[in-house]
Swiss-Prot record:
SUPFAM superfamilies: HydB/Nqo4-like. It is found in: Cell inner membrane. One of its GO terms (molecular function) is NAD binding. InterPro entries: NADH_Q_OxRdtase_suD (IPR001135), NADH_UbQ_OxRdtase_49kDa_CS (IPR014029), NDH1_su_D/H (IPR022885), NiFe-Hase_large (IPR029014). Keywords: Cell inner membrane, Cell membrane, Membrane, NAD, Quinone, Translocase, Transport, Ubiquinone. This is NADH-quinone oxidoreductase subunit D 2. One of its GO terms (cellular component) is plasma membrane. It is a peripheral membrane protein. It is an enzyme of class 7 (translocase).
Length: 402
């Protein structure tokens, strides 16, 4: 018996406990089976699949337009970033370019998504190690951002706002003004959170030198996003492979040097400031003369005609009906498109057979690679550190289980 458990001492055996699926620090439906030697973690076995809904298979039975809402339900704390990857993949296959105003709105809302995700993560990471105030402050700001989502798309979470070829509808000027007015006070909230956590003795004791990942290990495990930047690589798809109009934006990529939980926290804090900076640049460009114009391609075979036009023109009505019943055909081929989602590199590998439905849509979720490494990162740490490490990985189960 003792040999099977890998322990040497006769009569002694490791203690196995379940962490989750209803553990308050488990971030959704995570189940970890922990093997403990006293209080030291010997092995971590993550059990996934408790939120599996067969998303990739369902997408194969839907038209390209009907597939978009499935992406909101993957990483549901930053929904539009996922829609973005799918739309980019379909646009590559179709060979269409999004108008400039549509690109600016997409970038603006992707940065709102990044702040939504990082606010949730930083404040719940603080909650996991015992700080109760940050979530109250962070969620107040998230509430305002959810309102911006709602005013653009009609929904607070599952927006389904992006379309292949652009976005669903233009933003009213008042909404753009309100987002602009939100940016500067938000920086003060980040400063307040910073003052509360960054130099806090208890917060540092719980995070410094916990969950250290070297850069070589980060690449070997397939990490991306904050997880590799925390280990010292200035790798960000917005700079490395700029998509939409990120090449025009002026922003910095924060990187860590220790690769521990504390560095990852600091990077997320700085990324929120950089996102607010990008948002302000987007708003300035949306207000400029060259930022005016359509928000989506004006090809009625791909994007529906305007309501007013449908009331006048029979052709427009036919286009609309065909688009929402049959959809459009995408040229045969395969393509990989990736965006820098808040959690890391979110990729979509899309295979088209020339019909109106995707032949295959493989989703590359960043959280999946990070969760795989839980065993490797947690070994040798104490039981109490497991929730701190889990918090700094930023895992959402919608995208892990798909």
């Amino acid at each position: 018996m003792t040999e099977a458990l890998g322990t040497e001492t006769p009569g002694m055996r490791n203690f196995t406990i379940n962490f989750g699926p209803q553990h308050p620090a488990a971030h959704g439906v995570l189940r970890l089976v922990l093997e403990l030697d006293g209080e030291v973690v010997e092995r971590v076995d993550p059990h996934i699949g408790l939120l599996h809904r067969g998303t990739e298979k369902l997408i194969e039975q839907k038209t390209y337009l009907q597939a978009i809402p499935y992406f909101d339900r993957l990483d549901y704390v930053a929904p539009m970033n996922q829609e973005h990857a799918f739309c980019l993949a379909a646009e590559k296959l179709l060979g269409i370019a999004v108008p400039r105003r549509g690109q600016l709105i997409r970038v603006l809302y992707c940065e709102i998504g990044r702040i939504l995700s990082h606010l949730l993560n930083v404040t719940t990471q603080a909650l996991d190690v015992g700080a109760l105030t940050p979530p109250l402050w962070g969620f107040e700001e998230r509430e305002k951002l959810m309102m911006f989502y709602e005013r653009a798309s009609g929904s607070r979470m599952h927006a389904a706002y992006f379309r292949i070829g652009g976005v669903h509808q233009d933003l009213p000027p008042k909404l753009i003004d309100d987002i602009d007015a939100w940016c500067d006070p938000f920086l003060q909230v980040v400063a307040d959170l910073d003052a509360l956590l960054t130099d806090s003795r208890i917060f540092k004791q719980r995070n410094v030198d916990i969950g250290v990942v070297s850069l070589k290990q980060a690449w070997e495990w397939g990490f991306s996003g904050v997880m590799v930047r925390g280990s010292g690589a200035a790798w960000d798809l917005r700079k490395a492979q700029p998509y939409e109009c990120y090449a025009e934006m002026d922003f910095d990529i924060p990187i860590g040097k220790n690769g521990d939980c504390y560095d990852r926290y600091l990077i997320r804090m700085e990324e929120m400031r950089q996102s607010a900076r990008i948002m302000k640049q987007c708003i300035a460009k949306l207000r400029a003369a060259d930022g005016q114009g359509p928000v989506a391609v004006e090809d009625n075979k791909i994007f529906p005609p305007r309501r007013a036009e449908m009331k006048r023109s029979m052709e427009a009505l036919i286009h609309h009906f065909k688009l929402y019943t049959e959809g459009f055909r995408v040229p045969a081929g395969e393509v990989y498109a990736a965006v820098e989602a808040p959690k890391g590199e979110f990729g979509v590998f899309l295979v088209s057979d020339g019909s109106n439905k995707p032949y295959k849509c493989k989703i590359r979720a960043p959280g999946f690679a990070h969760l795989q490494a839980m065993d490797f990162i947690c070994r040798g740490h104490l039981l109490a550190d497991v929730s701190a490490i889990l918090g700094s990985l930023d895992i959402v189960f919608g995208e892990v289980d798909r």
